[in-house]
């Protein structure tokens, strides 16, 4: 039997009697338990839980431990083809009273067209902010489903941008057109950009009314302060370093060749024994997007000053460390530095989930890719985070801090 904290019970009490709800609780306040308990209260025979790929195993463990064991639910991993077939067979057994729950990731959902045949079920979205782009395939698919009940969970439902709430409003049953939503709550102006006119957001209006309307449709907003929880004070220690000189050349000329072995500008070196041509990487910033991408890489991935600072930070402590990174090549270079110090390494990325060292070694270094782990996961065995490079998204930055600064943290 789950015992909820007072603020978690308060969130459930505020949505009592509602079958379409959104729990926008600050990161680290335990949305997982609130959402799953609401699903238990709604008591649908069929439940579909959609989350990030990296959170599949965490959600399955949570549901098995608390609902399969205590309430005899059947839990299915819908990323497994065989279990997906079993789930759909169980759905068809309408005379079977056993509660079933399928767990699937966002990227796979729209590839399982048969899910559109589901009806009378509870739909739960973990990190519902991931459907904020209503034109994306996954968002279109999820918005086309026909659930009886909806549970949305997010610590940053808008990423600071209210215009991205519209798709979640639709799931909550607020029947407002996108045009009217923008007219009532978004301030815009038309600006010229590279010869084209586009609508630029300049601010927001009627925000209190927007939050009131969302509350009427089952949304609960709660910060850590609202929950009455005191967490240890966060201390940010900026480590400043100059960008590599190659960055400035690239920014001026929009093109540069990097030697990936030396992290300096590439110079062809060919003789009888061979050539270094395979170490060349040409960066061409011929569009605004590629220019920005390669500029970021030259400040982080290809900046030797960063690796020197990283080495010094790791050498300065024997505590567990969490390291957030953007690019796989960054992680591989840092992993080599850490292993040379004979410290255990864990990795959480889109391809790898190996947390053994994190769980069992107090001096471990855990590398987490922003997209894979910033928006979910409890890493509060550690109390220090190193940001090797920053993400483009404010939302990922905010959420990443809550991997250690969360309920139960005491240092």
What are these regions (language model features)?
Residues 45-46, 81-85, 89-92, 122, ...:
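Conserved P-loop NTPase motor "coupling/switch" region that bridges the ATPase
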Residues 55-81, 172-176, 342:
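Conserved helix-turn-beta segment of the N-terminal RecA-like "Helicase ATP-binding" lobe
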Residues 34, 43-65, 160-164, 326-329:
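Conserved Walker A/P-loop ATP-binding site and its immediately adjacent core
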Residues 105, 132, 331, 344-411:
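Conserved RecA-like P-loop NTPase helicase motor core
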Residues 226-340:
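Conserved helicase/translocase motor-coupling segment
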Residues 1-24:
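Conserved pre-motif I regulatory segment
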Residues 83-122:
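Conserved helix/coil segment N-terminal to the catalytic DExD/H
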